[in-house]
Amino acid sequence: MICIKQIYSKNSKSCYELDLISFNHWNLHQWENELEKDYITAIAIYFKTSILGVCVFHKIFDELEIRYLSVHPSYKRRGLGKKLIHEIIKDNKNDKVKRIFLEVSAENKQALSFYEYFGFETISIRKKYYKDGSDALLKEKMLNK
């Protein structure tokens, strides 16, 4: 059975292991620090006891920023990422969140297509932002009340 639950610093190792095979974005220490922050919310999509996907975000007033979103490579294109985004939108519409921001590499075509599906639009470009020289796209989605 698939379910979505909030996760905490005790889940850092599982998040790190998922990250290693997905992005290799954050090290274990960064995961521990991120999930210990009071202003950070993290949710995971589980199958039984295994984490298949993670989304880390924070809210400031009427804005929400997605800091990390990943699904296990073996479970991509099965709607799990969509479930995480739908959960964030559903849970935060009532909290007066008006818009959602995120940053994504201009080279990550799969992610760009995914975010386009949800209506995210590019509002800014950070030229040669990543180590590989690729641009970062700042994306925004307005939530209609």
What are these regions (language model features)?
Residues H72-R78, A106-N108:
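Active-site acidic-Proline motif in GNAT/NAT acetyltransferases
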